[in-house]
Amino acid sequence: MPSPRAGAAARIAVTAPAASSFSFEPVFLVLATAAVYGYVRLAKRVERPSRGRVALFVLGALLIATSLNSPLETIAVHYLLVFHLLQNVMIADWAPPLLVLGLTPAMRALVAARGGRALALLTRPRVVLPVWLAVWYGVHLPVLYDYALRHPWLLNLEHGALIAAGLVFWWPVFSDLPHRLSSAVRLVYLGAAYAGSAFLSLALIFSARAFYGFYEAAPRLWGLSPQKDQNLGGILMNGEQLAVFFVAMSYFLLQLLSEDEESQRALEGR
């Protein structure tokens, strides 16, 4: 008699679409389109952005739209955890900083003004850091992760939470409003975020068992076992976060050193 897990795998295999087929999440396609439309309106009414800023913002919107409306979505929600984790880092770690960097200073000032006290509170490092970490770990809890994969409404909610948390996390890194942080504070903030979030990827890398029952029962691609799939997902997550945070922290470290040099020159010039 086949085991319950084998039976579940057979049912999923029957219902799973071809890995190369497109999946669509219209809500994120609409949101990405609306973001670009709003950006164009701001560019006309507030401040004309440089081509570089336009490219950054559009790339951020495209990452959200394409990661959730493509074969990547199909493989992520029907076959492999590593592809789902790739989706998550694209919408949580890549797209948000690109969107924030794509805004001009005048655009950020307008957003900060309209965000009012709520944005001022949410973008305080001591508030946003634990919120960001709570969303990051909460979304990846096995019980919620497995349930969301079987209930699209919750999966969409989780993806939306990752995007929103990413935006408020990266806002104080690249925007001086509503709070102007020193380079030293931004450096510590980013370091604490990386250190705090790394435990998840390390657990995925070194665990001897698969955490997510959905992917244990899912049809396999390219001969990847559930455990190997999970280990690769952890390596991917850890590697990309290391790269993203290293680049950001390196920038602010150079800024800090430059500020120290300027202060020293000012003292010597007295």
What are these regions (language model features)?
Residues 5-270:
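Alpha-helical membrane segments of multi-pass proteins
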